[in-house]
Amino acid sequence: IAEFSDPPFRGDVAPNVFPAYYLILKCWGRRFDYFTIPGEKALGCYTPYKSRERIKIIPQGFDLNAVKRRPYEPNPQPTFAYAGRFYERIRDPRFFFDFLETLDADFRFDLYINCLDPCFAEMIRQAQQRVRGRIVLREALPRERLIERLGAADFLINFDNTTSNATPSKLIDYAMTGRPILSFNDRTFDPDGFRAA
């Protein structure tokens, strides 16, 4: 049995993937009787490598008792947070950082990034210099501590994937904080709605 969390590369996400990669995946897939995936949305990403009846959907598990939830206390300045990774053409936040430069208000945006690509590190560095509020790059934390920290924000940011083949597992963690979640990507972002939040 092979377990997946994120789908393998597809042409809509990574059009320049080495062509033999798909053949390698298909050969590799033959070594397993079944694939398990966390959600039905991603099914089409796996059927080129394994027949539908050999793909089982098993949602990701979590232990709610392992999470300590603090009582919410409003922050002195609007504070919002994001946890996860950024990916070019999939989960690219440049539009949001450009928007933050237009805000004429104090705020704090906490970023918990577990792996930061150089292009996004530079984007964050430049934005930190240009915004009126603060953008704070925090260290990656173990899941339970991260959920507790996220619960101290006024609200959470989820950058929706531009592809529809996966749902970020961070939404489970976000929901466990009890904080409001604003989800959007560059096509669905509403600047006026954000200002009202």
Model-inferred region functions:
Residues 13, 61-78:
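Acidic anion/phosphate-binding donor-loop and adjacent secondary structure
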Residues 8, 17-35:
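Membrane-proximal helix-turn-helix segments that form the acceptor-binding/catalytic region
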Residues 27-30, 142-153, 176:
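Short acidic alpha-helix that forms the nucleotide-activated donor recognition element
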Residues 77, 113-115, 121-145:
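Nucleotide-activated donor-binding/catalytic signature segment of Leloir-type glycosyltransferases, i.e.
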Residues 41, 60-61:
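Carbohydrate-associated surface elements
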